[in-house]
């Protein structure tokens, strides 16, 4: 009895990620091929599209400038981070400073909005 494509696909869909990775390596060795995607002409445009498709899910909130209303910014930094007054003041005055790391996109954007409304400059990395 011959094995159909559907049987092969069903078998592959039931593999764990580790087993699938090992299978790909064996294919590469046996057939002398590579699983690396081929770059096409106009690579810069394709690279931008790939980056957009692979959207980040975790962000670092980096304060780049405390702005003119430092007291208001310090209050927001304290509320966002739970830092004490001195630590928050140092973070606002010694820029750039990373306020939070590995934050969800929605939380990072909300923090950025609050800080920018107070006059600070913020980057999400």
From Swiss-Prot:
* Superkingdom per UniProt: Bacteria
GO biological process assignments: translation
Q: Which InterPro entries match?
A: Ribosomal_bL12 (IPR000206), Ribosomal_bL12_C (IPR013823), Ribosomal_bL12_C/ClpS-like (IPR014719), Ribosomal_bL12_oligo (IPR008932), Ribosomal_bL12_oligo_N_sf (IPR036235)
Q: How does it assemble?
A: Homodimer. Part of the ribosomal stalk of the 50S ribosomal subunit. Forms a multimeric L10(L12)X complex, where L10 forms an elongated spine to which 2 to 4 L12 dimers bind in a sequential fashion. Binds GTP-bound translation factors.
Q: What does this protein do?
A: Forms part of the ribosomal stalk which helps the ribosome interact with GTP-bound translation factors. Is thus essential for accurate translation.
* Protein family: Belongs to the bacterial ribosomal protein bL12 family.
* Name of this protein: Large ribosomal subunit protein bL12
* Organism encoding this protein: Campylobacter jejuni subsp. doylei (strain ATCC BAA-1458 / RM4099 / 269.97)
- Give the classification, highest ranks: Bacteria, Pseudomonadati, Campylobacterota, Epsilonproteobacteria, Campylobacterales
